[in-house]
Amino acid sequence: MSDLQGRKIFKVFNQDFIVDERYTVTKELGQGAYGIVCAAVNNQTSEGVAIKKVTNVFSKKILAKRALREIKLLQHFRGHRNITCLYDMDIPRPDNFNETYLYEELMECDLAAIIRSGQPLTDAHFQSFIYQILCGLKYIHSANVLHRDLKPGNLLVNADCELKICDFGLARGFSVDPEENAGYMTEYVATRWYRAPEIMLSFQSYTKAIDVWSVGCILAELLGGRPFFKGRDYVDQLNQILHILGTPNEETLSRIGSPRAQEYVRNLPFMAKKPFPTLFPNANPDALDLLDRMLAFDPSSRISVEQALEHPYLHIWHDASDEPDCPTTFNFDFEVVEDVGEMRKMILDEVYRFRQLVRTAPGAGGHGAPHAPQVPIPAGAGQGQWKAEDPRPQEYVGQMNDLEAELAGGLDQRR
């Protein structure tokens, strides 16, 4: 990795994109705050890959930690059929580098593009998507990891309806000990529309239920064709949730950790829960029953991933013998590292070790035989042009009013 030998330079979004000489860049796929992505083809095998250039890795400590977290978790989960597979990594200029290249599975589009394309999807599509999300999430949770940013844009889909979870940059560890758990829950800026109410309302700790809430929001979006809780800000987000789910009971209200937020909710007029069959009159009743259990306001009442996989709505796909747990839990000890120089060394070591692994054992890491549900996506889905709305909050909340700031920071704000 000492120089550009064995690599080629392409222009992607007007930036230099340095790739292994075996590959030719074929298409620009996207760009965002954390980097740019293109499609490429292996000139020897004709297989396609997605190459992600993570930029400005060390411009902020939070970005360096995010890159390290993503690299480690993609390796840990490598091979599960519903989690994006990491094929290779590269740091072309390791001396004082500020960018890292990740070679991953190439997928057709993300679920957000499919939903927003307006193409008709059937109940069979919904079952397939939710089942695959839950299979991937079961594997993630069994490693004591919370994804914390599940949303349609982080679910990659192929034309044959194969779905894979991506983007682990906001993931954190989970412990049954609330005090130990709380230590990992910092710098949380996950997407507002899919964010569980207990996070905004500062319940004592987070649990795996926060990811289940996000899956419920995704199911509702599939059923309705648009985001279910589309808050303009955090106060509006909370209001929209309460408007649909109704006023929480006293036991739940008493667990709201933020006094200001608790007072706000108590001072609202009583709201009755809106029946899901009224909101989604054409939906499968089993889908609405699962949705109701996923969107339980109180996380202690929310259905678990394991229970959801056994729900009647998913019986056509459910096979306990083909829904594996991760063999090992994930070690989050690196999270305590705060020195950027140390993180730079850790990322370099991770990339070097992984390159050695894939060059000596290319097939390492498989878990479970691929079996993508064969429900084709309608032609044209994901092909249309649409302007994505970004509900992600700012990294700071200093210009918000007091209640908005508390809801944005949630439990993290109190640490």
Swiss-Prot record:
Its EC number is 2.7.11.24. Gene3D superfamilies: Phosphorylase Kinase, domain 1, Transferase(Phosphotransferase) domain 1. ATP binds at L29, G30, Q31, G32, A33, Y34, G35, I36, V37, K52. Residues 23-314 form the Protein kinase domain. Disruption phenotype: Leads to sensitivity to cell-wall-digesting enzymes, as well as reduced sporulation and fertility. Abolishes pathogenicity by blocking the penetration of appressoria into plant cell surfaces. Does not affect the ability to trigger early plant-cell defense responses. Affects the expression of MPG1 and GSK1. GO terms for biological process: cell integrity MAPK cascade; negative regulation of glucose mediated signaling pathway; negative regulation of mitotic cytokinesis; positive regulation of calcium ion import across plasma membrane; positive regulation of calcium-mediated signaling; positive regulation of developmental process; regulation of fungal-type cell wall biogenesis. GO terms for cellular component: cytoplasm; nucleus. Keywords: ATP-binding, Kinase, Magnesium, Nucleotide-binding, Serine/threonine-protein kinase, Transferase, Virulence. It comes from the Eukaryota. PROSITE patterns: MAPK (PS01351), PROTEIN_KINASE_ATP (PS00107), PROTEIN_KINASE_DOM (PS50011), PROTEIN_KINASE_ST (PS00108). One of its GO terms (molecular function) is protein serine kinase activity. It catalyses: L-seryl-[protein] + ATP = O-phospho-L-seryl-[protein] + ADP + H(+); L-threonyl-[protein] + ATP = O-phospho-L-threonyl-[protein] + ADP + H(+). It is an enzyme of class 2 (transferase). The keyword Oxidoreductase does not apply. InterPro entries: Kinase-like_dom_sf, MAP_kinase, MAP_kinase_CS, Prot_kinase_dom, Protein_kinase_ATP_BS, Ser/Thr_kinase_AS. It holds the Pfam family Pkinase. Its cofactor is Mg(2+). Residues 363-394 are annotated as: Disordered. Mitogen-activated protein kinase; part of the MCK1-MKK2-MPS1 MAP kinase (MAPK) signal transduction cascade that is essential for cell wall integrity and plant infection, but not for plant defense responses. Beside its role in pathogenesis, the MPS1 cascade is active in conidiation and cellular stress responses. Targets downstream of the MPS1-MAPK pathway include transcription factors MIG1 and SWI6, as well as GSK1 and MPG1. Belongs to the protein kinase superfamily. Ser/Thr protein kinase family. MAP kinase subfamily. Interacts with transcription factor MIG1. Interacts with transcription factor SWI6. This is Mitogen-activated protein kinase MPS1. It comes from Pyricularia oryzae (strain 70-15 / ATCC MYA-4617 / FGSC 8958).
